[in-house]
Amino acid sequence: MTLASPPQIKPLTDEELHKINAYWRAANYLSVGQIYLLDNPLLREPLNKEHVKPRLLGHWGTTPGLNFIYVHLNRIIKKYDQSMVYIAGPGHGGPGLVANTYLEGTYSEYYPNISQDAGGMQKLFKQFSFPGGIPSHVAPETPGSIHEGGELGYALVHAFGAAFDNPDLIVAAVVGDGEAETGALATSWHSNKFLNPASDGAVLPILHLNGYKIANPTVLARLSYEELESLFVGYGYKPYFVEGSDPALVHQQMAAILDTVIAEIHSIQREARVHGFSKRPQWPMIILRTPKGWTGPKEVDGKKTEDYWRSHQVPFGNVTGNPEHLKLLEEWLKSYKPEELFDANGKLIPELAELAPKGDRRMGDNPHANGGILLRDLVMPDFQNYAIEVPQPGRVMAEATQVTGKFLRDVMKLNLDSRNFRVFGPDETASNRINAVLDVTDRTWVAQKLPEDDHLDPSGRVMEILSETCCQGWLEGYLLTGRHGFFSCYEAFIHIIDSMFNQHAKWLKTTRHISWRRPVASLNYLLTSHVWRQDHNGFSHQDPGFIDHVVNKKSEIIRVYLPPDANTLLSVTDHCLRSRNYVNVIVAGKQPALQFLDMDAAVKHCTKGIGIWEWASNDQGSEPDVVMACAGDVPTLETLAAVDILRQHFPDLKVRVVNVVDLMTLQPKTEHPHGLNPKDFETIFTTDKPIIFAFHGYPWLIHRLTYRQPNHNNLHVRGYKEEGTTTTPFDMVVLNDLDRFHLVMDVIDRVPKLGYKAAYVKQQLQDKLIEHKHYISQHGEDMPDISDWQWPY
């Protein structure tokens, strides 16, 4: 038998075949009912237009295939007592997953009002894509779902993320042939190079070739067997083909192939667990080719519909206004013979109900799909033990991420036995200087190894692949199944997963309002190699805009932190690793930098999120003349250097220095739970004094966050304004008017009392900027009085 040939054996008895096909019919019937019906759920009376929804929404085309796979996986779960999670890549087939969780009983357990009778079925139908009801996709509201599948491309990475460190779990990942055309999905086939059969679970990819997308054929469906086989053998899989349109034949094929692949998976795992890991296995996968819109109308209004793109969404509309369409819908629904599937009360008949697994073996009730149930707190070292000694502010140098790397190393060490913490990054763990974690673990790697390879091992817990999308997807799958993780990335290139962040934030927002969904560990980003220290790589590597993107999401979900030094980064990192159901974004530098706060001060500052730095201010006992605010490590440095210049030239000027570590404190409390109420904002920023705000990112973000706060008219923000190149570190801030000299000139322009002396000081500052340009063009580095500056007070 070649890989492309289905087996000729028939593993199902006639009775088993009849029951499996009947169960599939029931799932298909419930799926069509959700799309079309408002009432008359069991067709106990002739269908009329009052029984049909006025707006028909949903996707039929992929749904019968999803239902077909589900019933066959149920058989496997029962036969092998296998723990299994179902990921529907084509998540627009939401009716199918809702139907199957209803048939197995889990849906009614989570939603008792959707009961196992005719009344419950009517509610099930009505609620789908209906105001006040449920969404059309495999959304968080769907029991058993960890993957909505609305934005395509992430089925496999979520599946592998779920399988890591879950040795008893098989994740069935259905990949739609449309989804298979996305870049994210194309790369995620390589996840098999990171799956350790000795300690991880397994992923069973099921590539569903139904041939069409919304209005076009799919690429993979038009490849020959030989090309498909070569493609997936090249990816490292052993593909098995199942295909056809005759349900009886395809049921037998699918049952036989599933028996084969499950036996292979168990054999691979048994070999690795008994004898140890020896080489990367060739994991099996299934390529299932069935008609799009299978069992639906073959034609509508004389046009081909089944096995064609016209069945993708609602195969036909205008049911209430077209008697022929109403008749067609009734015939379609009756073709499933619901009277044979449901009893007089509308409940699935017992001989079919027994096909579903029991308890938490049901895929809708598998605890891995509600990961908060399994979540255990990390064992955490005391972050204060890693403190940098700061006897005086602005004198000691340290690398913030390197210090935090030692803390993460010990987080990893303390949780090695629990196997519930991993670090993720696109080949940047060393570059971002958190590579101390490699003192206690290695990079995960099950592909070929060479003698000179460094820190590569199948049991490693640092996940590195040069794909931000894979890292993000693995981490999401890992978190949603009840574990913890940490993702470090270059700041500019985290934009690659902007849309993935969107989807995860939406998932978290929705789950907060679903009582049975338990909180999961937060998704924690460390963004470093940031805009102000990418002077060596140039303009392409300079973009602080991810935080602009993040703050668009619901305040109950997102947190943004800009720790100015190593001790504050330690405090923030500890806080984020302990948190639940958030997306935490930390932006911090990796280069040697001045340290400002000892650990006690850092903890207090991070707890408040914003505060006046008394040691840097000289307005005690009086009103300040100007507020110098800053957020971010480099803006903090430039602000303090500017304050030094102001003190030298204007010793009578009263300056208040405010540092922001929790960016969301700037919003009003009505907008974000961390926000300041207007009175507290006035206390810090005054009611009428100029505020010069040096910000890490794009200036208008500060204006957005504070526009409802008092004294906004006096707020002047400096930040990144899309000026950059390969240059020196200080020249980067000069190019964007964020340097100490421009900040002082901003004060001069906004504090009238400085009088005649201001003109001379301003001219001196302009001369310094000219001197700077000449110096770097001649020497290729910053002037010593810039690079060697320290806080002198």
Curated annotation (Swiss-Prot):
Entry-linked InterPro entries: Phosphoketolase, THDP-binding, Transketo_C/PFOR_II, Xul5P/Fru6P_PKetolase, Xul5P/Fru6P_PKetolase_C, Xul5P/Fru6P_PKetolase_CS, Xul5P/Fru6P_PKetolase_N, Xul5P/Fru6P_PKetolase_ThDP_BS
Requisite cofactors: thiamine diphosphate
NCBIfam families xrefs: PRK05261.1-1, PRK05261.1-2, PRK05261.1-4, PRK05261.1-6
UniProt key word Lyase: yes
Keywords assigned: Lyase, Thiamine pyrophosphate
Stretches of the chain forming a coiled coil according to its record: none
Name of the featured protein: Probable phosphoketolase 2
Family: Belongs to the XFP family.
UniProt xrefs under HAMAP family: Phosphoketolase
